[in-house]
């Protein structure tokens, strides 16, 4: 669903910021 996709996007952003 949309929230699953949004969660994946947010996770990717947080992962990028963690670098």
Swiss-Prot record:
<keyword id="KW-0964">Secreted</keyword>
<dbReference type="InterPro" id="IPR013157">
    <property type="entry name" value="Aurein_antimicrobial_peptide"/>
</dbReference>
<keyword id="KW-0878">Amphibian defense peptide</keyword>
<dbReference type="GO" id="GO:0042742">
    <property type="term" value="P:defense response to bacterium"/>
</dbReference>
<comment type="function">
    <text>Shows a medium antibacterial activity against B.cereus, L.mesenteriodes and S.uberis.</text>
</comment>
<dbReference type="GO" id="GO:0005576">
    <property type="term" value="C:extracellular region"/>
</dbReference>
<dbReference type="Pfam" id="PF08256">
    <property type="entry name" value="Antimicrobial20"/>
</dbReference>
<protein>
    <recommendedName>
        <fullName>Uperin-2.3</fullName>
    </recommendedName>
</protein>
<keyword id="KW-0929">Antimicrobial</keyword>
<keyword id="KW-0044">Antibiotic</keyword>
């Amino acid at each position: 669903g949309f929230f699953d996709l949004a969660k994946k996007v947010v996770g990717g952003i947080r992962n990028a910021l963690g670098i």
